[in-house]
C-alpha cells in the first residue's frame, strides 16, 4: 500500500511538471477538468493522469446506491486524501467503467440548444446583464471575465508569496497580476465552453495559454490550478442545476403526455366496445 501511495504522489508531481511544460499539455488537462469540474485541482490532475477521457467519476458506493456495478477487473482512479498522518488513497470510477443489470442510467447533464436562453437568463441573474447576447458562447466568455474579476484577488495574493524560485520571480507585481489574471480567465472560459459542448479552439489558441510555462514550480501551478478549478465550478454548478431542472421538467411532461394518451386510448376502446 505504501508503495502504491508513493507512486501516486510521484504521478501527481510528474503531471504537474508536464502540464506546465507547454500550452498543449495544459489544454489537454483543462479538457479533462471540464468534465470533472466538481473535483479540486489535485483530484482533476490525477484523473487526467490515469483516465483522461473520464466524464463522470464517483466512488463505488455511489454507483452501487444508484443500481450500478463496477465492471470486473476495472482499476480505480487513485486520488490523494490529506490526513493528520499524511496522505491516504481513495478510489473513484468513471461511469464508463460501470454497468447496470436493470439498465438504469444516471442523467449526466448535456447542454442543448433549447436550454440556452434559460441558462443565459440564470447566468445574468448571478453575474449581471451581458453586453453581448449573440449566443451562449459569448455569454460564457463574459461570465468568465466577470467571475474571475470578482474572485482572483485572494489567489493572486497567495501567488505573490510563493513566486520566488519560479520564472514569475523575474516579473514585477503588475506583470505577474496581468499574466495570472489573463491565464485564469482564459482557463475558466475554456473549461466552461468545453463542458457546454462548444469547441474552445474556436475562441482560443495555444498562445492564450503560453504563460503557463512560467508557473514552473509545484507551488505556483497549484495556486493557478486551484483558482481555475474553484472559480470555474461556481457557474458550472449553476448551469448544471438549470439544465437538469429543465430536463426533469421535460421528463415529467412527457410522462404526463404518455399517461393521458394511454388513458384516452383506453377510454376510446371502452366506448367502442360498448357501442358494439
Model-derived features: positions:
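N-terminal accessory/interface modules of nucleic-acid-binding and processing proteins
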Residues: 1-276
Amino acid at each position: 500500500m505504501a508503495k502504491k501511495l508513493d507512486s501516486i504522489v510521484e504521478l501527481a508531481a510528474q503531471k504537474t511538471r508536464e502540464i506546465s511544460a507547454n500550452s498543449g499539455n495544459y489544454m489537454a488537462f483543462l479538457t479533462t477538468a471540464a468534465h470533472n469540474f466538481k473535483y479540486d485541482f489535485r483530484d482533476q490532475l490525477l484523473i487526467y493522469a490515469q483516465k483522461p477521457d473520464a466524464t463522470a467519476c464517483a466512488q463505488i458506493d455511489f454507483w452501487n446506491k444508484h443500481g450500478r456495478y463496477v465492471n470486473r477487473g476495472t482499476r480505480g482512479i487513485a486520488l490523494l486524501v490529506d490526513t493528520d498522518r499524511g496522505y491516504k488513497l481513495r478510489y473513484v470510477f468513471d461511469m464508463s467503467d460501470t454497468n447496470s443489470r436493470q439498465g438504469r442510467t444516471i442523467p449526466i447533464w448535456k447542454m442543448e440548444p433549447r436550454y440556452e436562453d434559460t441558462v443565459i437568463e440564470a447566468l445574468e441573474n448571478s453575474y449581471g446583464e451581458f453586453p453581448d447576447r449573440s449566443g451562449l458562447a459569448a455569454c460564457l466568455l463574459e461570465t468568465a471575465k466577470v467571475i474571475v474579476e470578482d474572485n482572483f484577488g485572494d489567489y493572486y495574493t497567495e501567488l505573490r508569496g510563493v513566486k520566488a524560485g519560479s520564472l514569475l520571480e523575474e516579473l514585477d507585481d503588475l506583470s505577474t497580476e496581468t499574466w495570472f489574471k489573463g491565464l485564469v480567465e482564459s482557463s475558466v472560459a475554456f473549461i466552461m465552453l468545453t463542458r457546454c459542448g462548444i469547441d474552445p479552439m474556436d475562441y482560443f489558441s495555444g498562445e492564450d495559454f503560453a504563460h503557463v510555462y512560467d508557473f514552473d514550480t509545484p507551488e505556483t501551478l497549484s495556486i493557478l490550478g486551484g483558482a481555475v478549478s474553484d472559480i470555474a465550478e461556481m457557474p458550472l454548478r449553476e448551469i448544471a442545476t438549470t439544465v437538469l431542472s429543465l430536463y426533469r421538467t421535460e421528463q415529467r411532461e412527457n410522462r404526463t403526455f404518455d399517461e393521458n394518451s394511454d388513458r384516452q386510448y383506453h377510454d376510446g376502446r371502452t366506448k367502442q366496445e360498448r357501442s358494439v
